């Protein structure tokens, strides 16, 4: 079985082909970061229009990369949510039209389930059950995963997601979009403990997150450090970035440890854009070693949005006979807990 995957939920156009026998055989990606940089963030209308321009050429490029024709595709998977409604509709419409024209089944895939499945594309994939930390610009969730579709939300952000807090704080530091990535690079040059940020919601029971207060704390710290010209010196910027990142990482470590101890699980899967953060990876690895457990995450190119994770997730579900009807429907808000469970599917 060969599945074409299409991802258009936000500002990346991703197309990939997953082959049951050979694994991932094509992966094409176009990022809109440069286009949105002038605006300091994603402009939904521009994102949608660019997906219209790029999706079909990327499908053609993926088929060429895999040395396949359309007649050799057995199904199409597409991101149907959560995400920007206009961007989602582009991918969904193209996927549904191609599935009808090629006479193959189509499947609407949950974007965050795609991220959750991304580590399955690696050489040493995790086995169920495990705790999943989904951490991106739009989501920060701790999920108990018993199998495909068997999800229990243990905790999530009650305000800003971690990635959103990174981006907003980076912007306060005068960094260009995407500011979160630039903040992490700045933090590497920071002096530890010059500034100490709070670790929100770690002084009480529970697994929920709150990151909006860290952004406010950063703003107040920045304002207190401005010189007479209203500027921050470079080392102070690095030190504030370091303190902010350390607070986020510490908070996540504490919550992950609680989730593992609460469930008795020994495997942790981390996925989503922020899962590429070097410090977070290093400290989670140290924590899991102390707990005699193991942490799994996708390679950096599959941390951000991509078509490979959608193609793979679509393959798993289409193989079990799941499919979507002919209607073009997207879900900008879509709880993962409503997804169909694939019974007794404990190894993929």
UniProtKB/Swiss-Prot annotation:
InterPro entries: ATPase_NBD, Gcp-like_dom, KAE1/TsaD, Peptidase_M22_CS, TsaD
SUPFAM superfamilies in alphabetical order: Actin-like ATPase domain (SSF53067)
Cofactor: Fe(2+)
A GO CC term attached to the entry: cytoplasm
Positions in coiled-coil regions: none
GO terms, molecular function: iron ion binding; N(6)-L-threonylcarbamoyladenine synthase activity
Pfam families in the record: TsaD (PF00814)
Cofactor stoichiometry and binding remark: Binds 1 Fe(2+) ion per subunit.
Localization terms from the record: Cytoplasm
PROSITE patterns for the chain: GLYCOPROTEASE
Keyword tags: Acyltransferase, Cytoplasm, Iron, Metal-binding, Transferase, tRNA processing
GO annotation, biological process: tRNA threonylcarbamoyladenosine modification
E.C. numbers: 2.3.1.234
Residues that bind substrate: 134-138, 167, 180, 277
Family annotation (NCBIfam families): gcp_kae1, T6A_TsaD_YgjD
Summary of the function given for this chain in its UniProt record: Required for the formation of a threonylcarbamoyl group on adenosine at position 37 (t(6)A37) in tRNAs that read codons beginning with adenine. Is involved in the transfer of the threonylcarbamoyl moiety of threonylcarbamoyl-AMP (TC-AMP) to the N6 group of A37, together with TsaE and TsaB. TsaD likely plays a direct catalytic role in this reaction.
Similarity annotation: Belongs to the KAE1 / TsaD family.
Protein name as it appears in the record: tRNA N6-adenosine threonylcarbamoyltransferase
Species this protein is from: Haemophilus ducreyi (strain 35000HP / ATCC 700724)
